[in-house]
Structure formats: C-alpha cells, structure tokens
C-alpha cells in the first residue's frame, strides 16, 4: 500500500476532522481520482506524435491511456469529428496514491523555475487542476528518447465541498502551494 494512503488514513483524516468540525470521518474530504490529459493537436499531420504521447503517458501513469477524439468539426483548426487529438488516463485506487506521491516528492520539485503551485487553480468545488509544461519532470521518462517536449494537464478530483476544504486536504499532503 502507498505510504501516502496510510498517511491520509492515520493523520490527515483526524487533522481535517478537528479543523472543520465534522461529525463523522466519512464527511472528511478525500481524493477520488486523478486525471492526466495530454492534448496532441499536431497528431492531425503526424500520427506518430500521438503514439509517442501515448507511450509517454503510459510510462508516467503505469496505465494505458484512452485516445480522445474531436467531438465536433472545427474548420479553423482543420479537424473533423472523430479525429484523434489527444489521450487521457484516469487513475483511481492504489495507482492514484502512488502517482500522487511521485508527483509531490519527485516531479514537482523538478519543474524549472519552480516557486510553488498556484492556490487559485481550484474550481469552486474543491477540485484542483494544474498544467505541466514538460513531461520530462517525471523520472519514468528517459530524456534521450524524447522526440518532443509535451505538456500535460493534471486534475485532482476530491469529495471536498469548497475550495477551502480542498486546499486544506492537499496542503495536508505537503502540496507546495505558493504563499
């Protein structure tokens, strides 16, 4: 079992229960899922770019990504409905906890010119979204085998009712928020 999951159960739950005066431990916010999304608009011209993005996301998440397709045709972008334009992975359970641990301890500190994550990236319902400009911050990606530096979106979905609760939950995991 992931160390972060044990830490959540043993310490974070009690900490948040006293802070927000919850009646039951089931009211304490928890992380439901983590979604990784990589948009590859250039895949329209070169199909190999999408395959490389899928390989990168597989290495980062440990799970095979779902290829996302365009929902509708947009003439300005020269895409048609059904064209593959990206890939995404939804992590739950043990893989989610292991990824979160790697993200906090290894990947985020490797971001270039890192001064902390913005606390303004909450959506109003306690979910947190962040963008990563380079996939090479993850140790699973071999820098020499990267054909192109790609970014990805990371969304952490929680059961928190407000941004304050969501931020308290992530701060309890030592998320490096900007002061």
Swiss-Prot record:
<dbReference type="InterPro" id="IPR022803">
    <property type="entry name" value="Ribosomal_uL5_dom_sf"/>
</dbReference>
<dbReference type="GO" id="GO:0005840">
    <property type="term" value="C:ribosome"/>
</dbReference>
<keyword id="KW-0694">RNA-binding</keyword>
<dbReference type="InterPro" id="IPR031310">
    <property type="entry name" value="Ribosomal_uL5_N"/>
</dbReference>
<dbReference type="GO" id="GO:0019843">
    <property type="term" value="F:rRNA binding"/>
</dbReference>
<comment type="similarity">
    <text>Belongs to the universal ribosomal protein uL5 family.</text>
</comment>
<dbReference type="InterPro" id="IPR031309">
    <property type="entry name" value="Ribosomal_uL5_C"/>
</dbReference>
<dbReference type="GO" id="GO:0000049">
    <property type="term" value="F:tRNA binding"/>
</dbReference>
<dbReference type="GO" id="GO:1990904">
    <property type="term" value="C:ribonucleoprotein complex"/>
</dbReference>
<comment type="subunit">
    <text>Part of the 50S ribosomal subunit; part of the 5S rRNA/L5/L18/L25 subcomplex. Contacts the 5S rRNA and the P site tRNA. Forms a bridge to the 30S subunit in the 70S ribosome.</text>
</comment>
<dbReference type="Pfam" id="PF00281">
    <property type="entry name" value="Ribosomal_L5"/>
</dbReference>
<keyword id="KW-0687">Ribonucleoprotein</keyword>
<dbReference type="InterPro" id="IPR002132">
    <property type="entry name" value="Ribosomal_uL5"/>
</dbReference>
<keyword id="KW-0699">rRNA-binding</keyword>
<dbReference type="GO" id="GO:0006412">
    <property type="term" value="P:translation"/>
</dbReference>
<comment type="function">
    <text>This is one of the proteins that bind and probably mediate the attachment of the 5S RNA into the large ribosomal subunit, where it forms part of the central protuberance. In the 70S ribosome it contacts protein S13 of the 30S subunit (bridge B1b), connecting the 2 subunits; this bridge is implicated in subunit movement. Contacts the P site tRNA; the 5S rRNA and some of its associated proteins might help stabilize positioning of ribosome-bound tRNAs.</text>
</comment>
<dbReference type="GO" id="GO:0003735">
    <property type="term" value="F:structural constituent of ribosome"/>
</dbReference>
<keyword id="KW-0689">Ribosomal protein</keyword>
<dbReference type="InterPro" id="IPR020930">
    <property type="entry name" value="Ribosomal_uL5_bac-type"/>
</dbReference>
<dbReference type="InterPro" id="IPR020929">
    <property type="entry name" value="Ribosomal_uL5_CS"/>
</dbReference>
<protein>
    <recommendedName>
        <fullName>Large ribosomal subunit protein uL5</fullName>
    </recommendedName>
</protein>
<keyword id="KW-0820">tRNA-binding</keyword>
<dbReference type="Pfam" id="PF00673">
    <property type="entry name" value="Ribosomal_L5_C"/>
</dbReference>
């Amino acid at each position: 079992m992931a160390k972060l999951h044990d830490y959540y159960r043993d310490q974070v739950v009690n900490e948040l229960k006293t802070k927000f005066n919850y009646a039951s431990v089931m009211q304490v916010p928890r992380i439901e899922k983590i979604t990784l999304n990589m948009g590859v608009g250039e895949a329209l011209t070169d199909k190999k770019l999408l395959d490389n993005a899928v390989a990168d996301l597989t290495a980062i998440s440990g799970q095979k990504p779902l290829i996302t397709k365009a929902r509708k045709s947009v003439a300005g972008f020269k895409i048609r409905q059904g064209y593959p334009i990206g890939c995404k992975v939804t992590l739950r359970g043990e893989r989610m906890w292991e990824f979160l641990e790697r993200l906090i301890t290894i990947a985020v500190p490797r971001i270039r010119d890192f001064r902390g994550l913005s606390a303004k990236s909450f959506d109003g319902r306690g979910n947190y979204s962040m963008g990563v400009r380079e996939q090479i911050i993850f140790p699973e990606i071999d820098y020499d085998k990267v054909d192109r530096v790609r970014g990805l979106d990371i969304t952490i979905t929680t059961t928190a009712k407000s941004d304050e609760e969501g931020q308290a939950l992530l701060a309890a995991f030592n998320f490096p928020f900007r002061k």
